[in-house]
Amino acid sequence: MVSIPVLKPRTTPAADADGALRTTRRLTGWGRTAPTTATVLRTADLDVIAEAVRTAGPRGVVARGLGRSYGDPAQNAGGLVVDMTALDRIHSIDVESAVADVDAGCSLDTLLRAVVPHGLWVPVLPGTRQVTVGGAIGADIHGGNHHTQGTFTRHVLSMDLLTADGQVRTLTPDGPERELFLATTGGMGLTGIVLRAKIRLDRVETSYFIADVEQATDFGDMLERLQRNDEDYTYSKTWFDSVTKGEHMGRGFLLRGSSAKLEDLPPELRKDPLKFDAPQLARFPDLFPSGMLNRLSAKALNEFYYRKSKTKSGVVQNITQFYHLLDLFADWNRAYGPDGFLQYQFVVPFERADLLRASMEAIVDSGHISALNVLKRFGDANDAPLSFPTRGYTLAVDLPVKKGLGQLCDLLDEMVLDAGGRLYLAKDSRTTADRFARMYPQLPAWRKVRDAVDPERKFASDQSRRLQLVTG
């Protein structure tokens, strides 16, 4: 076993005698909408966290990681929020068995930087590495390789869950508390607080990707290319132009690839094939006004991006180029201005691919603009009742907040429901309890497991109240 040195928790000024820092903070999700105020507890002391859970007031408690959920699942107006970023140690990495034992507050970026030099890789990554392990479990995140690797929790061997009674339970996918494991998977922190997890890693020869880029002339061409040979690639995603109307609506490109083998690299990269090349260039200042993204600026951006992405094959790319372009810029969400934005993401069955174009037409006709549009194919669903991915197409669009956005999203909700689809809890910030219940028919089964482990409803969030996830 190769042991990584323990990472010390970040220092916290003005901490209490028990090492905990308690503050009152205004919190939002990554979309910077619907701010609420809560008491925030930040500590690496598990006993302090357990006591805070046991003594939580009537507004309850919820855990929060790096705040990358777009909506309100890690907010708790008038209640307690446990900031997990102090609990960020990597306890060990077993290179032989390819297993990492990590705290829930450890980010995927930190974990990757630790394991890549040993020829290991985190098997499922979302669109950013700035997500904690606990958040990855709570949202059951997915990546561009869902069709080959499933969701993040498919690779979780065990997790330690702090429940409402202050006890810590070790859960496994096939253990005696399998139902609680599955309820925690995608359960948005409402079954308890994940403290620690063991993650099964993949083996890689290099830290690079070998990628193919294909231009598509419209939505139909895009879908045809995806269907033709998507299974030949480990990772697959597309970007498309949502501003151009008419016959070229949906033009864009497919970016697909797999982990590069040593033989795929040019000589200069073979000297250090496991170098983790993921720089951060700049931090967005909080100076941008709302409304900068309009039809004119979005059209120019779409035109540039489309023409830049020419068809080519066998391109060697680092993780930033291939997967995490937005991680080049810290706080990039500030680019939408103080009014913020929401990301609308849904999945529909393959046979309802018609909804993809129909939804984009509805957005264009409404006068709203989205410059960041991503389309992917999902593989089969898992057994977790609130896990989002299910077999079909998933579409994600970023929409700046402006007048009429609520009505547009209500329309999209009904279109998604009519097609047998559903929304992603980690992205949602505004749908209704009724619509959510219709999208997730296993919600009653999830509530039964959740209520059994938390009969006093101690775990709660702004999202859980809005969607009536926790009842009684």
Which residues make up each language-model segment?
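Noncatalytic alpha-helical scaffold of FAD-dependent oxidoreductases
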Residues: 1-472
